[in-house]
UniProtKB/Swiss-Prot annotation:
The keyword Coiled coil applies. Residues 107-131 form a coiled coil. It comes from Homo sapiens (Human). Its main location: endoplasmic reticulum. N-glycosylation plays no role in the catalytic activity. Heterotetramer of two alpha-3 chains and two beta chains (the beta chain is the multi-functional PDI). Belongs to the P4HA family. Highly expressed in placenta, liver and fetal skin. Weakly expressed in fetal epiphyseal cartilage, fetal liver, fibroblast, lung and skeletal muscle. Expressed also in fibrous cap of carotid atherosclerotic lesions. PROSITE patterns: FE2OG_OXY. It is found in: Endoplasmic reticulum lumen. This is Prolyl 4-hydroxylase subunit alpha-3.
Length: 544
């Protein structure tokens, strides 16, 4: 098998090849890439057009109903209206026999709503699935956890970190988008259905608070009500061990729905539990945050993400420096790259303005039709997982001349051979709502890894290009190196994954922090060991 065939085989195994656009548009994956979320605006615009036509039709129908109402009312307001008049008597009987029936069973009303329903059914297949709602809700919980966001603030559209009594504004949107009681209920219910009461309770509490404030108002788009929120919150508190709160909320529920026998039985049950063991069940239980999947480095990872890439103490280290880099290559002599060395062991460098705006845009445009849900290696299988939320596509070097130029620039800057099969095709990634990639290595850590099927060794280096900027979040966190690098538009981040001995460098454990606000795009060029023997020779020291 030739080098090119081996590379193609690897990408087929990874299930991340250039792909099929129709497969890329699978329902249930909208939340996993911001570009897919943006595409969901198109069907909603079509729905708005349908609703506008429906409203216009209903306005005309209501004007006609108002005319009919005023006409009949005027007859009833005149107490002297003589029913002895055969004309009036006839019209009265006609109204009661046919006019009112026509009004109540108006064909116009049914035609208006039928047109709206038919239009909805035509675009329904293009709408996000329930799995997208679940994914978006889990994304809000992820942001809540990693950035220590206050749920009440989020419901008001404010991104605030709360630590004890201190409140820090992480991001101030130009326009506030507040959530409704029904919005908060749906987030809480996703957690509730997973048995995750740590997240369910604050969201359901906010739902109850908002529903209380608007009780009696009817909103046609709402699926839930105050009673629904009280019901779920009461049971969540009970499962969390707080019977006192469960009882209080259940009693409030019965004020609104006194005939609910199930809730009445719950009240009796909670009262009995409190009477039997008041000291045990009155005290508010401490609810542990779930750690699924188990992540040993979670606290370090989240602490680095919370810096949002701002770590000024790094710039006090004398051995770190900035320079104009040519790598003694003629290709870069007339246009050197601005280089910022941000860590030495492992070696990590940031190259500013590595690509232009037009190049970044072109790469995004080339990749967008082929984006598919990102997967991770699990043994010899490739799986979609909750700890990696993004979509990705692979672009062959020959797809566009700009990619050829990009490869020449990477090769000139790194001094490495980036031609297939010594390097993989360019992987372009678009992150989703709260998109992230929890701590991982880029190099293979198992002999059974699909990476070895390229027959070109392990991934010796990573060259990651930021193709966009973000408003907040999305930093690249190096866990054991204890630093995070913010998203810098058009810059490229480079690091060695392997020591010169060929052993993996455990200090390169890194993560993509959740995107708080913004649309994050990156492009990865992974360079393999083979082909670099004389470009990065081995060392007698295993630590080099």
């Amino acid at each position: 098998m030739g080098p090119g065939a081996r590379l193609a085989a690897l990408l087929a195994v990874l299930a991340l090849g250039t792909g099929d656009p129709e497969r890329a548009a699978a329902r249930g994956d909208t939340f996993s890439a911001l570009t897919s979320v943006a595409r969901a605006l198109a069907p909603e615009r079509r729905l708005l057009g349908l609703l506008r036509r429906y409203l216009r039709g209903e306005e005309a129908r209501l004007r006609d109903l108002t005319r009919f109402y005023d006409k009949v009312l005027s007859l009833h307001e005149d107490s002297t209206t003589p029913v002895a008049n055969p004309l009036l008597a006839f019209t009265l009987i006609k109204r009661l026999q046919s006019d009112w029936r026509n009004v109540v069973h108006s064909l116009e009303a049914s035609e208006n709503i039928r047109a709206l329903k038919d239009g909805y059914e035509k675009v329904e297949q293009d709408l996000p699935a329930f799995e997208d709602l679940e994914g978006a809700a889990r994304a809000l919980m992820r942001l809540q956890d990693v950035y220590m966001l206050n749920v009440k603030g989020l419901a008001r559209g404010v991104f605030q970190r709360v630590t004890g009594s201190a409140i820090t504004d992480l991001y101030s949107p130009k326009r506030l988008f507040s959530l409704t009681g029904d919005d908060c209920f749906q987030v809480g219910k996703v957690a509730y259905d997973m048995g995750d009461y740590y997240h369910a309770i604050p969201w359901l509490e906010e739902a109850v608070s908002l529903f209380r404030g608007s009780y009696g108002e009817w909103k046609t788009e709402d699926e839930a009500s105050l009673e629904d929120a009280l019901d779920h919150l009461a049971f969540a508190y009970f499962r969390a061990g707080n019977v006192s709160c469960a009882l209080s909320l259940s009693r409030e529920f019965l004020l609104y729905s006194p005939d609910n026998k199930r809730m009445a039985r719950n009240v009796l049950k909670y009262e009995r539990l409190l009477a039997e063991s008041p000291n045990h069940v009155v005290a508010e239980a401490v609810i542990q945050r779930p750690n699924i999947p188990h992540l040993q480095t979670r606290d370090t990872y989240e602490g680095l993400c919370q810096t949002l890439g701002s770590q000024p103490t790094l710039y006090q280290i004398p051995s770190l420096y900035c320079s104009y880099e040519t790598n003694s290559n003629a290709y870069l002599l007339l246009q050197p790259i601005r280089k910022e060395v941000i860590h030495l062991e492992p070696y990590i460098a940031l190259y500013h303005d590595f690509v232009s705006d037009s190049e970044a845009q072109k790469i995004r445009e080339l990749a967008e039709p082929w984006l598919q849900r990102s997967v991770v290696a699990s043994g010899e299988k490739q799986l979609q997982v909750e700890y990696r939320i993004s979509k990705s596509a692979w672009l062959k070097d020959t797809v566009d001349p700009k990619l050829v130029t990009l490869n020449h620039r990477i090769a000139a800057l790194t001094g490495l051979d980036v031609r297939p099969p010594y390097a993989e095709y360019l992987q372009v990634v678009n992150y989703g709502i709260g998109g992230h990639y929890e701590p991982h290595f880029d190099h293979a850590t198992s002999p059974s890894s699909p990476l070895y099927r390229m027959k070109s060794g392990n991934r010796v280096a990573t060259f990651m290009i930021y193709l966009s900027s973000v408003e907040a979040g999305g930093a690249t966190a190096f866990i054991y190196a204890n630093l995070s690098v913010p998203v810098v538009r058009n810059a490229a981040l480079f690091w060695w994954n392997l020591h010169r001995s060929g052993e993996g460098d455990s200090d390169t454990l890194h993560a993509g922090c959740p995107v708080l606000v913004g649309d994050k795009w990156v492009a990865n060029k992974w360079i393999h060991e083979y082909g670099q023997e004389f470009r990065r020779p081995c060392s007698s020291s295993p630590e080099d």
